[in-house]
Amino acid sequence: METATNIFSSSIYSWYEKHGRKDLPWRKNISPYSVWISEIMLQQTQVKTVIPFFDRFMKKFPDLNALSQASEEEILALWTGLGFYRRAKNIFAAKEIIKINFDNKFPSTFDELVSLPGIGKSTAGAILSIAYKKSFPILDANVKRVISRHDRVDLSEKKSVNKLWQLSDLYTPNKKIFEYTQGIMDVGATVCSIK
């Protein structure tokens, strides 16, 4: 017998299989590196704005080895026009830490990821679930919207973020984690959009 939690999760990944935005550039050739760059670029920025910046960035720095040689100025130059330049500076700082502390290998645990500048719980969860296919919750703006509406969580309450993290963790399945994570972000961006 399926629980309400399983029904929610399976509905999300079934929706993704039929309607998901699989043509986005960061959903091709998926790696921890490409997920990281896309997630940082997508913070507080619309998908349509990010696409050309992501494409240019990946053309110049297609992998962590290429990025490891980049100067902060080169990264900032590619970021020009995207805004929120602190994100680009965090990418530079994080790649330096990865080079020194992780032998230029992308971290693969939650604790390692959140130790890097600019990577919080949700970005770490996205990297782990999308690139590594590990069961980790995420809670970006789109996911907050989906879960808060589904479970009638009042976002104006102080404890709402903790409640949403608990629900996100509860709903995050152990199977089809890639489809679920991409799906819940897409549902929030396309169906359950901002009012």
Report residues per predicted region.
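Catalytic cores of DNA base-excision repair glycosylases
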Residues: 2-6, 11-195
